[in-house]
């Protein structure tokens, strides 16, 4: 079974703020990971509820607003053992296919992923699948009721209802 060997290029820790379906968003953070970053670098990301300003509105994920991770030092993570879920799963990710079944994605901007895919025996070791499953669960919650799911747009600093996104 082939295993990913990080090449410490730092590409995964830069260009973290991207356009996604018409909104500008940063690296996803689980609520318990917010403390890993300075408060001014974290904003809400996903919320569930009728309206963001209402009492029962629940923020289910946050996002890093910095384009580069502040923990990247000499192309290495200075907080590797406690890095966020999004970082743990990288360069792999899980998404949902047409039948709502998990589909494995691989970020081919990662040189280690390219090397792994080019030299694989057909089986990949996905050691942090549990982390990818946690992020996939957020997607499932959003897709269960897209009219009650909201995404915080970093460009406008406003909430956008998920079903209204591009």
Placement of each model-derived feature along the sequence:
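Short loop/turn segments that flank or connect secondary-structure elements
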Residues: 1-166
